[in-house]
Amino acid sequence: MAEQQNPFSIKSKARFSLGAIALTLTLVLLNIAVYFYQIVFASPLDSRESNLILFGANIYQLSLTGDWWRYPISMMLHSNGTHLAFNCLALFVIGIGCERAYGKFKLLAIYIISGIGAALFSAYWQYYEISNSDLWTDSTVYITIGVGASGAIMGIAAASVIYLIKVVINKPNPHPVIQRRQKYQLYNLIAMIALTLINGLQSGVDNAAHIGGAIIGALISIAYILVPHKLRVANLCITVIAASLLTMMIYLYSFSTNKHLLEEREFIYQEVYTELADANQ
């Protein structure tokens, strides 16, 4: 039971095991493996942006007109090595505590649902912004490329905040040192989320994915926390309901027949395939 009371504070080497962070480590290694595959085997074009589009980046003109598969794939892609390094570091640091707090099944559910949901939220947000601006009537096709695990990471960060709030307020640790450490970790996570969102205000950052991932992660974790830990069937039902709601949202918003969107979709694919044909000559 001590493990459940103190997931964010490893007291001694004896309490640490590789198995306790196996899922977090697997997710980090998966992101690294996909990136190396991406740059070694899946980059036939000179343009980095075109390669990302070809491989499955989240482009709202494509994702909202049938390419729903871009949501899960884009969360495993990264634009460059620095982007990958920062995300993997954040995933490892935050994921360790989250995995020990919620367990592997819940962590995986929060990570996947938050990541895919963040990509959907980002795609629709971009469409909403542009369709309600003067850019919508412009003849230029504006492409925003969304890649990275940051939406999923924001989801597990928000879930960690929810867990620590419950621990600090409702079940404070009897040891003052551990109690202070948990408070510091809570404050640090809140500060990290706030700084990420503030940094996302600058151009070139997909802040909609950050916001969407954080909201989804928080909602799922609240549902998990409200259900007693031992009720596995109830926790499974929460996961199924969350996944079903996400699937329904994808179905409702990812098959648009908007003429303007479809024209831009055709233009983007034509440009990429032309570049691909030229590269193969």
UniProtKB/Swiss-Prot annotation:
Q: Which InterPro entries match?
A: Peptidase_S54_rhomboid_dom (IPR022764), Rhomboid-like_sf (IPR035952), Rhomboid_protease_S54 (IPR050925)
Query: How does this chain sit within the bilayer?
Result: Multi-pass membrane protein
| Catalytic site positions | S150, H210
In alphabetical order, the GO MF annotations are: serine-type endopeptidase activity; serine-type peptidase activity
The family classification in the record reads:
Belongs to the peptidase S54 family.
- Main role? Rhomboid serine protease that catalyzes intramembrane proteolysis. Mediates quorum-sensing and the subsequent regulation of target genes via activation of the Tat protein export system. Catalyzes the proteolytic activation of TatA by removal of its N-terminal extension.
UniProt name for this protein: Rhomboid protease AarA
Q: Which organism is it from?
A: Providencia stuartii
